[in-house]
Every structure is written in C-alpha cells, then in structure tokens.
Amino acid sequence: MDLIAQLEAEQIAALGKEIPDFKAGDTIRVGYKVTEGTRTRVQAYEGVCISRKNGSGIAGSFTVRKISFGEGVERVFPLYSTNIESIEVVRRGRVRRAKLYYLRSRRGKSARIAEDANYKAKA
C-alpha cells in the first residue's frame, strides 16, 4: 500500500463511520445535520443516487436526486462529511450505467428505475 492510500485509510478509520454499500440507481435516505440558529436537527433527504465520485476514499462524494413539489432537486454529499448522521439504502435499483445524468431530462414513468430483487452484497 502506498503512502497516500495508507494516510487515507488512517483518516477513514479515525472518523469511525460505517458507510453502507450503495451505487448509482439505489434509492437512499441521508440523515443530514441542519443548524438553524442555535438548534441542530437531522433532516432526511431521500432520493435516487445518480452518481458516485472518487469511489469510497476520503474525498468521495455522491449525488442524490429527488422530485420535490414537481421540481427536480439534486444535492451532492461528501461521503465522510461530519454533517451526515446516517446513510440508509431504501431499495436497490438495477441500472446499466455508473452515472444516471439522463434522469435529469426525464419525468414520470420514464424516470423509473427497476428494482434489483436479487442483489448480492460484495463480500
């Protein structure tokens, strides 16, 4: 293992976060800490993961898209952000692409993603 990968592994271990195995096409629920004045609360943001960048390293991020009041909303979350309380996989999607940017131009039934019924987690 080279020096940079070793430093990354140490930083990830120091954070002590458990990141579930998810990919583009999966519907996920992100518990994100929101600070309003002096109060801090956890806000759930649920949508389809349309991309993952930089894998599962310390600099990794993922984009979640949802339709809110008829308008498409996307948020990019850093994978190891201290503001992320939890990441939960709601359902597994079956897609053939790593980046689902084509969903931006689709609405309704054409934007649906088939559920992956026989998903096998990596060992």
Curated annotation (Swiss-Prot):
- Please give the function described in this protein's UniProt entry: This protein is located at the 30S-50S ribosomal subunit interface and may play a role in the structure and function of the aminoacyl-tRNA binding site.
Q: Which Pfam families does this one have? A: Ribosomal_L19
What is a GO molecular function of this protein?
structural constituent of ribosome
Any one Gene Ontology cellular component term annotated for this protein: cytosolic large ribosomal subunit
Q: List the disulfide bonds.
A: none
Q: What is this protein called?
A: Large ribosomal subunit protein bL19
Q: Name one GO biological process term.
A: translation
The alphabetized UniProt keywords are: Ribonucleoprotein, Ribosomal protein
Q: Which family does it belong to?
A: Belongs to the bacterial ribosomal protein bL19 family.
For the keyword Ribonucleoprotein, the answer is: yes
